[in-house]
Each structure stands twice: as structure tokens, then as C-alpha cells.
């Protein structure tokens, strides 16, 4: 019988079990330094561990300009680790003032499994010609949900400032 790591982690969390993931002498194994940067130490005599244990979290409040990427880097976590822990539907959408529980010092940060591929199409085939903005929407998130590029959505909406979207605002969708 096989279980995913999330099943094991959820079971451990429900029983308040702290499973060691790595110890201070263990180094994270990565396949690509660019995809999974490993934490670095300052060269101090007693460097901090490169990995924490299950249950090591930091509560943080999202500030203006922060993304899951910047938060993950700050706490040596992964974008998808944070998204999973906080049950985020879209890791590209977080809000100023939102409180997140961040797993810290993760041995093998997951920065890819929860990401939806960015659309490459320039128009939606047979789709609706308009879209009504909802709370949390950004041009990036709307374009991603439609499977089109942000540039094509921006091009279909001259005069609309993407940073100033309002709830219930109607924008154009490029239709093929």
C-alpha cells in the first residue's frame, strides 16, 4: 500500500506527532540548484540546521509586495508547502493582511507541484467575451484561469489599469 507524503503528514499532524525530517547534520538533496535552492549558513561556529522537523511553523502576516515566493525564501520553505498548509486554491493569490502558517526550514522545498502552467494562448476559443472581476482577482490570475497570456488580456483591455481592478468590474476577454 502506498501513501503520499501529504497523507503521512496529515496523519501525523492529526495525532500531534512531530516526525523528524532531517537533523542538523543532514543536507538537503536537490536535483537542480536553480529549482530548489538550499539554505546557506553564515559560516558561524554553530550553524543552524538546514532542515527542521514536521511541526516547525512560523505564523506570518502578508505585507504589501510579498508573494509566496518571497515568504518561502525568507523561511526556507516551499511555495507549495505553504499553499498546502494554508489550503490556498491558487498560490499566485494572497492578500495583504492574510495570516499564513509557514512550514520552516523544509529539507526539500516544494516550489512546483501546486503551480498551474501559465497559458500560452492569445485568445479563448468560443469563450465568453467578458469577465467580471471577483475579490482577489489579478490580471495574471484571470489570464491563467482562461489559459491565455497576461499580455493578451492586457491588450484586450486598453485603458484598464491592472493594479486598480475593482470587484464587479467587467473586462474584455480576447475571443478567437
From Swiss-Prot:
Main location: secreted
Spans annotated as Disordered: 31-50
Function recorded in the entry: Secreted effector that enables the plant pathogenic fungus to manipulate host defenses for successful infection. Binds chitin oligomers and polymer with high affinity and plays a dual role, not only in the suppression of chitin-triggered immune responses, but also in appressorium function. Does not protect fungal hyphae against plant chitinases but suppresses chitin-triggered plant immune responses.
Compartments (UniProt record): Secreted
UniProt keyword terms in alphabetical order: Glycoprotein, Repeat, Secreted, Signal, Virulence
Subunit structure comment from the entry: Forms homodimers in a chitin-independent manner through interactions at the N-termini of EPL2 monomers. Homodimers are further polymerized in a chitin-dependent manner.
Intrachain disulfide bonds: none
Disrupted-gene phenotype: Impairs the penetration ability of appressoria in a plant-independent manner.
Lineage, top ranks: Eukaryota, Fungi, Dikarya, Ascomycota, Pezizomycotina
Leader peptide range in chain numbering: 1-18
Name of the molecule in the record: Secreted LysM effector ELP2
Gene3D superfamilies the UniProt entry points to: LysM domain
Other known facts: In plants, chitin acts as a microbe-associated molecular pattern (MAMP) that is recognized by lysin motif (LysM)-containing plant cell surface-localized pattern recognition receptors (PRRs) that activate a plethora of downstream immune responses.
Notes on the domains: The LysM (lysin motif) domains are small globular domains involved in binding chitin in eukaryotes. ELP2 contains 2 LysM domains.
Glycosylation sites: 111
Cellular component per GO, a single term: extracellular region
Amino acid at each position: 500500500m502506498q501513501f503520499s507524503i501529504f497523507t503521512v503528514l496529515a496523519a501525523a499532524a492529526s495525532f500531534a506527532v512531530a516526525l523528524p525530517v532531517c537533523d542538523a547534520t543532514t543536507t538537503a538533496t536537490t536535483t537542480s540548484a536553480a529549482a530548489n535552492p538550499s539554505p546557506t549558513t553564515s559560516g558561524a561556529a554553530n550553524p543552524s540546521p538546514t532542515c527542521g522537523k514536521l511541526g516547525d511553523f512560523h505564523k506570518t502576516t502578508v505585507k504589501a509586495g510579498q508573494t509566496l515566493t518571497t515568504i518561502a525564501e525568507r523561511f526556507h520553505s516551499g511555495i507549495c508547502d505553504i499553499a498546502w498548509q494554508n489550503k490556498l486554491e491558487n498560490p499566485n493569490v494572497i492578500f495583504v493582511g492574510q495570516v499564513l502558517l509557514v512550514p520552516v526550514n523544509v529539507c526539500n522545498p516544494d516550489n512546483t507541484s501546486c503551480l498551474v502552467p501559465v497559458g500560452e494562448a492569445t485568445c479563448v476559443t468560443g469563450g465568453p467575451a467578458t469577465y467580471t472581476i471577483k475579490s482577489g482577482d489579478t490580471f495574471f490570475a484571470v489570464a491563467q484561469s482562461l489559459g491565455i497570456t497576461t499580455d493578451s488580456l492586457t491588450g484586450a483591455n486598453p485603458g484598464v489599469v491592472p493594479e486598480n481592478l475593482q470587484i464587479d468590474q467587467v473586462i474584455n476577454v480576447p475571443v478567437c
